[in-house]
């Protein structure tokens, strides 16, 4: 299935049905009076978070969504039927933004959540509504109200327990393929991964979701290399596994570049718990490995893990470190807020 994490859609709720001008006409009833019914309300436009979706690809091929109009009223005080609603089905983690792409309308993170995007127009009153003591036979009715229309942006931020970050070709996709059943594209060139991938990791009878975030480059927070869209997926991750390519010229500089981008993007990315690991250890000679570990330890301020996804060296330790970091984050989130002290 193709992946799409952003889409622009046009929505319009249904117009209300018109009220009816009608008079009661029955045998032996000389002055039947008005009996025009009200128009039906127009259909609404909703967004609903559903299970089984992980992309917005459906909205590449259909961008316009219009709810049905309400039916007109009719004689014998019969009101028109309400117009049919339209429901935009989206995956968990979808943000709905106004046309300016900044004003958040809704953030759907749980299956079953629904939000009303545009309410249908009210139906018009039939002539029976306008009967008064001085006007016993009104000959006018209201038209229905027009529906509302908007252009909206849908933006998907994948929900995962942990995220893999690093420069292009750092071995993130290989790691994901090693520890999960996911089958990402793997090749020996940068930007092999062009969209985020998800996999389920099983460790000691426990499970968590791991996201492979495409490689970040300098200027990613400003949109270089679609980096701002990739960084948006990191927002939902509770813990980060930062992979640094052991074959790079300077592992410390590579680490700092990604940390700079996380900090510049904001949204709390730089404050997330982070596990640092040097990857591709299997193809480094002992002297080079020791030098890269020293550079990375100096840049990160703590000893990094050393791993190789190809040989599984250090992989179990990395997964258990991620699990421990997630447990610590959960314990921190569960702490009650401290009472305010004047």
Curated annotation (Swiss-Prot):
Cofactor(s) for this UniProt protein: Mg(2+)
The entry's Mg(2+)-binding residues are 173, 193
Query: Where in the numbering of this chain does the Obg domain appear?
Result: 1-159
Q: How does it assemble?
A: Monomer.
Task: State the family it belongs to.
Answer: Belongs to the TRAFAC class OBG-HflX-like GTPase superfamily. OBG GTPase family.
Identify the keywords attached in UniProt to this record, alphabetized.
Answer: Cytoplasm, GTP-binding, Hydrolase, Magnesium, Metal-binding, Nucleotide-binding
Q: Which residues form the OBG-type G domain?
A: 160-327
* Name assigned to this protein: GTPase Obg
Q: Where does it mainly reside?
A: cytoplasm
What the protein does comes down to: An essential GTPase which binds GTP, GDP and possibly (p)ppGpp with moderate affinity, with high nucleotide exchange rates and a fairly low GTP hydrolysis rate. Plays a role in control of the cell cycle, stress response, ribosome biogenesis and in those bacteria that undergo differentiation, in morphogenesis control.
GO CC annotation: cytoplasm
UniProt source species: Methylobacterium nodulans (strain LMG 21967 / CNCM I-2342 / ORS 2060)
The gene that this protein is the product of is obg
Superkingdom = Bacteria
């Amino acid at each position: 299935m193709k992946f799409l994490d952003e889409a622009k859609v046009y929505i319009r709720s249904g117009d209300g049905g018109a009220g009816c001008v009608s008079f009661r006409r029955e045998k032996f009833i000389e002055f039947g009076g008005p009996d025009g019914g009200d128009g039906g309300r127009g259909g609404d436009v909703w967004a609903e978070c559903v299970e089984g979706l992980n992309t917005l690809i459906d909205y590449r091929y259909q961008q316009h969504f219009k709810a049905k109009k309400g039916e007109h009223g009719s004689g014998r005080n019969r009101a028109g039927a309400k117009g049919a609603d339209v429901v935009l089905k989206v995956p968990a983690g979808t943000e709905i933004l106004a046309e300016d792409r900044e004003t958040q309308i809704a953030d759907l993170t749980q299956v079953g959540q629904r939000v009303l995007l545009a309410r249908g127009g009210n139906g018009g009153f039939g002539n029976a509504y306008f009967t008064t003591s001085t006007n016993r036979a009104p000959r006018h009715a209201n038209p229905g109200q027009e529906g509302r229309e908007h252009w909206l942006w849908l933006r998907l931020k994948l929900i995962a327990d942990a995220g893999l970050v690093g420069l292009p070709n750092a071995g993130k996709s290989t790691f994901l393929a090693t520890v999960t059943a996911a089958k990402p594209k793997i090749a020996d060139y940068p930007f092999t991964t062009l969209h985020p991938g998800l996999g389920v990791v099983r460790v000691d009878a426990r499970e968590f979701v791991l996201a492979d975030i495409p490689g970040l480059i300098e200027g990613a927070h400003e949109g270089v290399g679609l980096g701002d869209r990739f960084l948006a997926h990191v927002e939902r991750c509770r813990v980060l596994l930062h992979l640094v390519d052991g074959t790079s010229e300077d592992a410390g500089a590579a680490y700092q570049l990604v940390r700079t981008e996380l900090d510049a993007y904001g949204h709390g990315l730089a404050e997330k718990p982070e596990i640092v690991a040097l990857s591709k250890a299997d193809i480094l000679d002992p002297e080079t490995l020791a030098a890269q570990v020293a550079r990375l330890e100096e840049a990160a301020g703590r000893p990094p893990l050393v791993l190789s996804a190809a040989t599984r060296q250090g992989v179990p330790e990395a997964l258990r470190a991620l699990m421990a970091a997630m447990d610590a984050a959960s314990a921190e989130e569960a702490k009650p807020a401290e009472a305010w002290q004047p």
